[in-house]
Amino acid sequence: MFHFARCSRLTRGTVTSDRLLSSHKTRDFLFQHLNRRGNHSAPWSSSQIPSTQLTVGVPVLRVWRQAQKLLRLTSRQQPRPPSIALKFILGPAALTVTARLLGPSAHCEADVNNNKVPLEVQVKEKIPEFSWAVLWEFVRPQLFALMGAILLAFGAAALNIQIPLMLGDLVNVVARHMREQAGHYMRDIQAPAVKLLGLYALQGLLTSGYIILLSRVGERVAADMRTTLFTSLLRQDIAFFDANKTGQLVNRLTSDIQEFKSSFKLVISQGLRSATQTVGCFVSLYFISPKLTGLTVVVLPCLVGAGALIGSFLRKLSRKAQEQVAKATGVADEALGNVRTVRAFAMEDRELEMYAAEVQKSAAMNETLGTGIAVFQGLSNIVLNCIVLGTIFAGGSLMARDDLSPGDLMSFLVASQTVQRSLASISILFGQMVRGMSAGARVFEYLALDPSVPLTGGGRIPLDSLMGRVDFMNISFSYPTRPGNQILKHFSLTLPPCKTVAIVGESGGGKSTVAALLERFYDPSSGVVMLDGLDIRTLDPSWLRGHVIGFISQEPVLFGTSVMENIRFGKPSATDAEVVSAAKQANAHNFITGFADGYNTVVGERGVTLSGGQKQRIAIARALVKNPSILILDEATSALDAESERVVQEALDRATTGRTVLIIAHRLSTIQAADLICVMSNGRIVEAGTHLELLSKGGLYAELIKRQRSNGHK
């Protein structure tokens, strides 16, 4: 839905509209008013406006004049600004503020010469909302443990209310013996002392109990959230990962869930306890001394409010310090992760300087934070001591008039400090709860996503009757992250069974996109991809990728485990003999057995301990171990040296026998024996034929061959 709004001049002949009107009624009025007054290439209405693109042909002065008139009409119901200048300032400003707070925004351009200019609509990123229903699904399995923790927390809070009263009884016994010098002191003090010790012991047990239960609940909820989120992320289509950075996704799995777990445990334990103690101790204070309670009610909230403000400042400073620590960590992570590049350019000193600079900034911020905390704690101690002194002064006056006993004064002091600590804890927990809910909302946002391409579900073709014929029929496609850039345009191609088809062309022509559509990483915008006459959208994607198609990319990614497990990744149920057989087909068996640990050799993160040719041959073995009917080679040898390319090409020649093969080629020397070579340009096939046929045409293929030979490729 398009929203028209405030216009601001960008260039001499162009204006840009980038704000919306808050009212649908106002928006429709503006459109209708413009339709009556202006000459447009097409009528505008709220129901006729396209969601993604509009063509505007209204002269800019007319548009601005109508917008000003609308502002005057809508401002009649409100007091007018004192001057015309103020009107021109406040009118657009009000629209701007409203636009910042509400809904999506749009960007349009209108040329003063009435030329048609495309209008793009961009929806603002929606802030994720916290879902209590989703939280309930995670908490429900731990409900009994959670209820037990809540009951124990209430019990501990109730005991904390009783402890000041018991302390008062103890003080009264001591004061009576000091005043009267009568009776047996040890006998009189024994009963209240034993009761107080019993309360302390029971309070300790209850506190330990609810902390243990809450820890159990929090850890299990966090584990379930991590597992569920990771499952949701793995099920997302490739377009999702194109649009989101890996670091952000990992941060949701780690930092956000950790933040939510900590907030969840703190809010339930300390929040319930603090709230119970605050209410209970206030009641106790009133029964002990209504007069002192009145003074406390006046003073205490002011002090807590001031403490909350200072605490808010310190929390912001703490957040900045943590962000600076994260920057320093990022520098170190980048340097250590790319240590080979750092070493190759002798940049160790520069990386050290960068890291030291970030660490120094972090240290300075943390020193400032430490100073702030020290000042805050010092002032807090002064204020607390002043409160104690004031309470003793006022309580002493009441004691002098026999309105208050020494024990009651002691009880009042302890209870009032309990209230103050509880209120301060609640104010801190409020900020913690906000951060926790924000973190939870970010996690829940990804849990609710449904992939456009499902991971499983659909039909399967019996492998013994699978022929391997692939048809691309009138395919048009744009990547979801770049909808305005069409990669394939009415693309059609047939891969005959057990034949090799190569696609060549300049970079950006759409070659790798064809392979991605066959793997069903994406669905085409229009057209259909067929496998043995069936639309692949009706087939099970997991079966298609796991049993039918083998994919070998230009830069294979290996996992930081053994060679055996890396090859078995292509078929988890493969036996050791099947793994060895696949390695032999890929020309990898000899160099693998040359390792000290053979197939149990750990290849390091991303296969860092292997050469490019070795990694590529292990990747070929990984694809062959599942015996695929269709093989996709996406520039599988373009990154290798001549010797490695020769060995890998021998393996590929063996692997392609008896299979339908799609080759995405950069080095044209590797595809001269293909049954069909298709030359792509701008998303279309412009030439097709065998190597000799295309050379004889003297077209784009011949030009590419000539260009590569002049650059040193055979």
Swiss-Prot record:
- Residues covered by the ABC transporter domain: 470-707
User: Where is the protein localized?
Assistant: Mitochondrion inner membrane
Q: Which GO terms describe its biological process?
A: potassium ion transmembrane transport; transmembrane transport
What SUPFAM superfamilies has UniProt attached to this entry?
A: ABC transporter transmembrane region, P-loop containing nucleoside triphosphate hydrolases
Q: Report any Pfam family annotated for this entry.
A: ABC_tran
Q: Which residues are noted in the entry as ATP-binding? A: 505-512
Question: What job does this protein perform?
Answer: ATP-binding subunit of the mitochondrial ATP-gated potassium channel (mitoK(ATP)). Together with pore-forming subunit CCDC51/MITOK of the mitoK(ATP) channel, mediates ATP-dependent potassium currents across the mitochondrial inner membrane. An increase in ATP intracellular levels closes the channel, inhibiting K(+) transport, whereas a decrease in ATP levels enhances K(+) uptake in the mitochondrial matrix. Plays a role in mitochondrial iron transport.
Q: What is this protein called?
A: Mitochondrial potassium channel ATP-binding subunit
